[in-house]
Regions:
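Short coil-to-helix segment of the ABC ATPase nucleotide-binding domain corresponding to the Q-loop/switch region
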Residues: 59-60
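Short helix N-cap motif at coil->helix boundaries in the Bergerat
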Residues: 72, 89
Length: 92
């Protein structure tokens, strides 16, 4: 779910499902083993090229730096960046 006043940069990927690499070898095909909701709350920003994984909430006013890989929730008015994304500051 994407709420109001959200800014999403170019080439952002929201991944709602994934699989373990072992599943490909075992079954010879991709079997979805992880799926979940992604929520982007009001007024948050997601920078260009970021990847958001399943079961993540980007809380209100949060900022995700370009190219970040978000593996867990981003607290309100927090700035995250990196692979995996980690807190680097707060929105003032």
């Amino acid at each position: 779910m994407i709420e109001d006043d959200v800014v999403i940069g170019p080439n952002v990927t929201l991944i709602g499902a994934s699989h373990k690499k072992e599943d490909i070898a075992k079954y010879g095909k991709v079997v979805t083993t992880t799926k979940g909701k992604i929520t982007v709350k009001k007024g948050s920003w997601i920078g260009a090229g970021s990847i958001i994984l399943p079961n993540v909430t980007i809380h209100e006013g949060a900022v995700v730096g370009a190219g970040a890989v978000v593996t867990k929730d981003v607290e309100p008015y927090t700035i995250v960046a990196g692979v995996p994304a980690r807190k680097i500051g707060v929105v003032k």
